[in-house]
Swiss-Prot record:
Positions of modified residues (3-methylthioaspartic acid): 89
Keyword Signal in record: no
Alphabetized UniProt keyword annotations: Methylation, Ribonucleoprotein, Ribosomal protein, RNA-binding, rRNA-binding, tRNA-binding
Family the UniProt entry places it in: Belongs to the universal ribosomal protein uS12 family.
Superkingdom: Bacteria
GO CC, one annotated term: small ribosomal subunit
UniProt-listed Pfam families: Ribosom_S12_S23
Chain segments carrying region Disordered: 101-124
Protein name: Small ribosomal subunit protein uS12
Physiological role: With S4 and S5 plays an important role in translational accuracy.
């Protein structure tokens, strides 16, 4: 416990909060170009082939981003928009690709949670 004299001499230093998505550089989204689109297997209790892409961002970072939803049209050189948000069972994946923007198509025949997957309202 510091004395009052010690606190007058040097004030308490504030704790620095470490960002969970440094590649975004305090922006809500970032544009980037896919350098590689591939599948990855999740951590221990889960089993699947998760679709991910390696993306070179305008901020200069190269990150791994998750492609949500069923089916996608991404390939190398596709221009995508990424947002923050990690995938718990994929180590090193801290970003999501936003569906329905730039070169990323929305999910076909999606009826629920459509806004999250860039799907238009179904024709009735």
């Amino acid at each position: 416990m510091p004395t009052i004299q010690q606190l007058i001499r040097t004030e308490r230093s504030r704790l620095k909060v470490k960002t969970k998505s440094p590649a975004l550089k305090s922006c809500p989204e970032r544009r980037g170009v896919c350098t590689r689109v591939y599948t990855s297997t999740p951590k221990k209790p889960n089993s699947a082939l998760r679709k991910v892409a390696r993306v070179r961002l305008t901020s200069g970072f190269e990150v791994t981003a998750y492609i949500g939803g069923i089916g996608h049209n991404l390939q190398e050189h596709s221009v995508v928009l990424i947002r923050g948000g990690r995938v718990k069972d994929l180590p090193g994946v801290r970003y999501h690709i936003i569906r329905g923007t730039l070169d990323t198509s929305g999910v076909k025949d999606r009826r629920q949670s459509r806004s999250k997957y860039g799907a238009k309202a179904p024709k009735e």
